């Protein structure tokens, strides 16, 4: 007998484990860029930002970490990722060279509103990058996020999960 | 000659014998408009009349022969000059001579083979048409009449489901399943996506139907992709163990049957593209080909016929159609 109406019943599915359904999701990754601090005096001043990471992804060695980084560290990270991985790396907030010129009415690159703008841009950048499955395989990203300091003479390599 | 108002010219009109009863269907023309054409199937006879009407009454029309052709051809847009004719039949209607008055000629192309379905695409067109021609010394008079051919199939004997596990190691593992690999044009795709591992932040998931028209051979193969449908099947972040159902009704979309290597000139294939999008707009996708086919219209049977068939299939059932029901069902 020819079918007049198609069979649209759902396919069989395994019932979900309640721990999986109500437990914490396996994709927890939170990165905050906070607490900008300007250190040094006069011409040798620079601003560092605190990078706080909380995660349950197995690829990160530490489930919680806190480090301080400056803008040039972010530039280094971006360069490393562009060269080592196939990721299309998002842009960083601007370098603001014009703000470093003398005779400005405001505080130049140490101006509060500029630092806040930059902080937001850096946070967006890190969240985009750290969540990328391919970027997560790069040693440079893990060193940037979780090691005490960035060793620019490191040997680039890929991270494999244990 | 007719240029200067001298000589005779004529109008040709082609009329099918079954024009009153034959079904017409809509078919897209090259410039995107939709027109209605008579529908034919493989093996059907094409018969009718060619009416030649003389424009200037009283004057005679000299000609070198009148004929009608049935042509099936493939036209590649980038190679307009060359038409590839895969069906070409001719019937002579009149030997060289002259017409003193308007005349009608009968023609019949018996049980014509029409191996492929009519198709108007982005870079290629396959069409069937009748062409009546009055050959003359300087310029021929001709008239074309397009028809549309559809190829029908019956339910495929083997129609296995598509089931596959895919993913990115340690980040995302899913198992997708579609209930069939061959769907007719008014079918429903019933499926599911089962999440085995979710370490990325998924925002939503959609399923797209992509049509790929391939023209050319060897080094000059050209693919034209067209997304026919985008259908969101999940909004939000799934976790491990979750199953998302898919129910996609194909009747709502304008599609053709799958055409593979038609006369070695072109193909039209369809793919289901499963797309997952994460919080940072990154897209993860898996494409899978499906076969589309055209089903003939359902044949309505009387109750007694249906009961007889049921009796043959199931042991012990009694075909007992009430006479009242049998009367109602006869078409």
Swiss-Prot record, chain B:
Coiled-coil stretches: none
Membrane topology: Peripheral membrane protein
Record localization: Cytoplasm; Membrane; Endosome
Single Gene Ontology BP annotation: intracellular protein transport
Assigned keywords, A-Z: Cytoplasm, Endosome, Membrane, Protein transport, Transport
Region (Disordered): 310-331
A GO term from the CC aspect: retromer complex
PANTHER family (UniProt xref): VACUOLAR PROTEIN SORTING 26 RELATED
Subunit structure, as described in the record: Component of the heterotrimeric retromer cargo-selective complex (CSC) which is believed to associate with variable sorting nexins to form functionally distinct retromer complex variants.
Task performed by this protein: Acts as a component of the retromer cargo-selective complex (CSC). The CSC is believed to be the core functional component of retromer or respective retromer complex variants acting to prevent missorting of selected transmembrane cargo proteins into the lysosomal degradation pathway. Retromer mediates retrograde transport of cargo proteins from endosomes to the trans-Golgi network (TGN).
Identification of the protein by name: Vacuolar protein sorting-associated protein 26B
Organism: Danio rerio
